[in-house]
Amino acid sequence: GAKVPFFRSAATSNDYATTADVIAEVLDAYERIGMCFGTACCIYPTAPFVTANAIKTAMMLLEQEQADSVIPVVKFSFPPQRCVVIKDGRLTPKWPENMAKRSQDLEPLYHDCGQFYCLNVERFRKQKAIWMEHVVPFIQDEMNVQDIDTPEDWKIAEMKYKLLRGSEVRV
């Protein structure tokens, strides 16, 4: 098996620890063994389509833009401005003023892909956050993004993997 330099503490191994808490603890642990970094990248284990090239590109973007962090994002497949809520068993537009607008006329909105975060360590230490003042987007294609939280998510990831990697792949 792989050798690991340390394990996360109980405080950062629970359902309530933030990613920033985990990154800070990992950076502290590396510093205790004499390893200090100017930049860091936290990769989520539930992001199956992350590639070395994507991380390299995001890290280059971090440096080129002198950003605090680079966060992969993907455009919502349908405009959230036209979402509905269920109240008393009936559908109600969240923003009624957008219901008659064409979807292509609404501002494109993006969300965090939950894949990885590239950080300037010094600025991260000062702000203790991933979402800092100068965050640069790393825009991803929807086919390269699939968060896995449910069995259905897993099935969708398998289908995307097969489409991306070719028909010779058995899933």
What do these predicted ranges mean?
Residues 16-21, 48-134, 140:
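Conserved core of the sugar-phosphate nucleotidyltransferase
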Residues 137-139, 144-171:
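Hydrophobic helical membrane-anchoring modules
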Residues 1-39, 49-53, 57:
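Short phosphate-binding loop-to-helix
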Residues 28-32, 64, 126-130, 163-166:
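Secondary-structure boundary motif
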Residues 3-4, 134-136:
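Conserved beta-strand segments of alpha/beta enzyme cores
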